[in-house]
């Protein structure tokens, strides 16, 4: 059901998704997660706050992690799809980030949001495993972003050193500047 309802529109680019694991009090430490999903008949009632959610404002759907069973640590975490616009689901203002500004990042607020059973991804208690599998796949992309940012910084440093004139010459001609740029290049 979930694949048919959500994946096709995400894969085609018609819809945008977000991943919400981190929380204000615990960061990405899932064992201290405060967001809860309480089973009530054919749905769950989800309450809590998520932060640092990339695409949180512009997303149509959010993958949400919440505690369905307290006292068992990460084994009590489950994963859900929550749709934008459902009662009790609010987006915070965008964070003013220093980088990766092509996507928004914000807090998300869930105040007794009614989520149907069929929006549970996997089974109850499998959320932590799903989160780790997703994060592992994303680490390559994050590393590529970091490498790209570092390379762009090196390129900007070289460019600036050729343009900046000090004592009648570009600072790129001074050995101290060359050493600093070489150090940056070696770190990359």
Give a label for each model feature.
Residues 1-23, 39-42:
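FAD-binding glycine-rich core of flavoenzymes that anchor FAD
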Residues 89-188:
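Glycine-rich beta->alpha junctions and the first turn(s) of the following alpha-helix
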Residues 43, 47-91:
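A short core secondary-structure module
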Residues 19, 37, 46-48, 64, ...:
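Buried hydrophobic positions in well-ordered alpha/beta secondary-structure cores of metabolic enzymes
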